[in-house]
Amino acid sequence: MRRLFIVLVFGLTAMLWPVASSAGAVGATAQAIGSLEADFNNDGFADLAVGAPTEAIGNLQGAGAVNVLYGSAGGVTGSGSQLFTQGAGGAAGTAEAGDGFGASLASGDFNNDGFADLAVGASGEAIGNVAGAGAVNVLYGSAGRLTGSGSQLFFQGAGGVPGSPEPDDLFGHALSAGDFNNDGFADLAVGFRLEDVAGAENAGAANVLYGSAGGLTGSGSQLFYQGASGVPGNLEAQDLFGSELSSGDFDNDGFGDLAVGVPDEAIGSDRFAGAVDVLYGSAGGLNGSGSQFWHQDAAGVVGTAQREDGFGSSLAAGDFNNNGFADLAIGVPGEGIGAAPSGDLAGAVNVLYGSASGLTGSGSQLFRQGAGGVGGTPEFDDEFGRALAAGDFNNNGVSDLAVGVPLEDIAGRENAGAVNVLYGAAGGLSGSGSQVFWQGPGGVAGTLEAFDWFGAAVSAGDFNNNGAADLAVGVPHEAIGPRFAAGAVNVLYGGGGGLTGTGSQGFWQGAGGVAGTAETFDQFGSSLINSDD
């Protein structure tokens, strides 16, 4: 049975929105070129954006909100934090029930002024009377902080953006920034996995908006889907192309490239096995020429494509062997380990390495709990690999990988959640010296509780500017007092020895200066900033 992140509260059905990942302090080649670490005020400290996509605005259930917390020498602080909602503080649009503002997040310097900007998915946005069509808000950085002044709202069929808004397209479900044409302005890829294409229901698609001195523009924007414009794969119903996006320079040619998750792609007769399309950048932007189609039955890729694996459900790019080519980690949260059902949905992560010709299956890896030094035991419904983030947590110049395991059972607490951390080296990622974190022990802030979903989202950034990436962990079902699923975020700090729970922090709305009020089912921490994967 396929595992869906669905919760029922007060008659509402809400999905745990897509996770976002970020790389911090990893070196330019590992980053999505042009994406710029999420430093909205350009003070040298990475900042943290946190989505609460089911936040109620007044009586508008699920309108959504985004908190922004700023970095400092002491790390992330709630002091001076901001709360953005549509139609307030200059942010474009109008808050409406079910908009899901904050469903996804991505950061890049879209106008190349030295300040990181923030793209916010509102995938449930109604366009006119078209419910769930989806939209993307863009907020711009400044010397003071992020501002709604000059903000933009993009959706299909307006301002040059190709396509037409249709019910439940979920435009903005996934976002990723990179400079795909290498003109110095970050561009934005937008996934909408429920797009119907040529009669193929929920085939999925992705738009690309290009940056300019005036910021993002729909002029020259592109529309990609499988089976057209050179994109590999057949156009099929229910593939969900565009469910996840990640940018990196996989062939190190100076142009950002884009990986697109297709987690419900059928491989042979195995439905929902999953795949990843990779599109390469050029002076003219992204194009299908030389694009690739990856899955577990592809040449060199470790593993076997099986029904309901969900290969491509999460993605993160980083230079895990420090050879100058970005590599790609691919979450396979439905992977079965051992005999079913005990190992069903235990989860795994594939890693493909970059080269002068792009990503290659040669030397690929498959990681799972309990093998090769990776901590933990593969168990039913753990979903190891549901979320991914790359960053140099030990400041040795090589990207490392954080892996969310949000449904991990810890000490009898069902679905408490955990995060595994794998470290990079000249030979690539390794389970040697890997770590496992969860709330409570080892100094990690918070209390170990059932159904918290620690690790549902992960994101890296150098919040204290010490040269090592730090890790933000979303805990969207954390109860704040009696308020179930109000949500929280933990921050763990990096250093020469890697990540540590010592000095870690816990943040939630209404405490420690964080703007807003913790309320039942806000799901603060469902999404985290996705700056450069």
Where do the language-model regions lie?
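Hydrophobic helical h-region of N-terminal Sec-dependent signal peptides
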Residues: 6-10, 14
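Hydrophobic membrane-targeting signal helices
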Residues: 14-20
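Conserved beta-strand/short-helix segments
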Residues: 3-7, 20-533
